[in-house]
């Protein structure tokens, strides 16, 4: 329909809106030179934050990219740090059954878990935990939690996850420390791609590194935590644009 409007109604404003974060696995979301040349794209594409503007032009510098409101992340933008958190470690599972199983397996191999510490699991709404692993096969110190992810993240110290999931990125800006078992080679590039502060996450290539990272963040020095949270807040404004009446008007 972009081709039709731009060919037969060239004076009509056509806009696109990409209201999500980015992953290297989704390179197909970056418009190409051919799409630009043949006018199958909107005249202007809006992203949800300043950090995405250059990324979106990876395959075509001629694109007209602007920043619009981060509608989906409105609550995250207004979030203020909550000191009291009741969950030490939460595993965030996604729609990939194999990846989710590996996240659970990696956790069970850590000394921290073997000592009997509680670990909470938040499964994806479309893939119940029962579809990944039978309840009787789960160690007793795994506890499933349900509810809005934002409320869980606000009460969590460490999030462990992998694969394509906006929840992992959101966790950073709810001031959780994020641990990423290296189950996908793209994992180590996604956060670099978005320029996420290095202090807020660790890539763990084995259970020993995962164990050490858990202990590091649970015993994080106050000064280090303060610096980490400050950097998160500074970067959040580049990742997610505030919703205002002015930027909502782009849709009118």
Please provide the spans of the model-predicted regions.
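Short, charged/polar "capping" segments at the starts of alpha-helices
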Residues: 1, 23-26, 52-57, 75-77, ...
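Structural motif
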Residues: 44, 88, 157-158
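Catalytic binding pocket for nucleotide-activated donors in carbohydrate/polymer assembly enzymes
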Residues: 42, 59-67, 134-140, 163-238
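Active-site and donor-binding regions of nucleotide-sugar-utilizing enzymes
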Residues: 1-71, 166-168
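C-terminal alpha-helical cap of glycosyltransferases
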Residues: 222, 236-252
């Amino acid at each position: 329909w972009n081709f039709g409007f731009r060919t037969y109604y060239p004076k009509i404003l056509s806009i696109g809106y990409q209201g999500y974060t980015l992953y290297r696995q989704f390179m197909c979301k970056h418009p190409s030179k051919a799409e630009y040349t043949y006018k199958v794209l909107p005249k202007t594409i809006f992203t949800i934050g300043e950090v995405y503007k250059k990324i979106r032009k990876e395959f075509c510098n001629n694109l007209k990219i602007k920043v619009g409101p981060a509608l989906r992340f409105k609550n995250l933008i207004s979030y203020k740090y909550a000191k009291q958190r009741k969950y030490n470690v939460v595993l965030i599972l996604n729609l990939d059954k194999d990846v989710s199983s590996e996240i659970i397996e990696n956790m069970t191999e850590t000394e921290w878990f073997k000592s009997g510490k509680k670990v909470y699991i938040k499964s994806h709404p479309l893939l119940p935990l029962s579809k990944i692993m039978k309840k009787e096969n789960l160690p007793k110190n795994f506890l499933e939690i349900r509810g809005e992810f934002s409320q869980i993240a606000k009460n969590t110290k460490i999030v462990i996850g992998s694969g394509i999931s906006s929840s992992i990125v959101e966790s950073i800006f709810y001031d959780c420390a994020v641990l990423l078992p290296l189950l996908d080679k793209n994992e180590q590039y996604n956060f670099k791609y978005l320029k996420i502060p290095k202090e807020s996450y660790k890539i763990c290539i084995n259970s020993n590194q995962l164990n050490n990272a858990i202990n590091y963040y649970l015993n994080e020095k106050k000064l280090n935590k303060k610096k980490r949270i400050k950097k998160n807040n500074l970067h959040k404004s580049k990742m997610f644009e505030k919703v205002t009446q002015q930027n909502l008007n782009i849709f009118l």
